[in-house]
């Protein structure tokens, strides 16, 4: 079984689950060494995304009465974002002799989670529960300042996803939101990396959905300092070191929570030279009005003469 954490829309990836069986203990039998116990096998389980995988345990033929206990462990898989159940289950098989036929038979069997754990109802409960953890990457854009373009200008971003070595990933991750019509609908993931270019303007938010736990991401905005924009990322200077790199980037790791990267581009100019001093503007306007009035009077007098 799979427990999915974070987004309600997230679906655990399909994979083949494998198991390891160990002869654990034997009692009430002429067999005293567990290594001499008959072998139990567990078939591989095909887990289909969004469903529950059924596990088939194959019991052997027994030649001795006794109580046989086997340890069954799930082998750790490679699906990104999945935490595999490390607690084994213990199968106990009771073999008795039929007094009427003298034949051996399996009288009872049962499962426990852990050595001293609770009984597992294989008919309705899950013997193994794996956790699939995802998080969304949210990218926001704001433009501030008296000269900032808050209506039409789109800013270019490059989003790069990098996976962990040895892990398997989905072929793509959906991109939603934003107002730019040509933004891609997903980031195509090729092996361990994927890159997409998106455009955001003031007030836009784009979300890359259901990134598996442990996925690294980098969000880089183009350099707009030539247009007199000053960039900050999550409140820090776009040129600081650390998680914010010198190329206006935010680099972090998905940890099963929504990660928000907020880019703010500020363009402020307090010294705009228009050739007019605002402190004198009312007087200049009044003076221009006086000149206009004089001109009208002069023209009228000439016409009368």
Where are these regions (language model features)?
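Solvent-exposed loop/turn and edge beta-strand elements of beta-rich ligand-binding domains
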Residues: 1-305
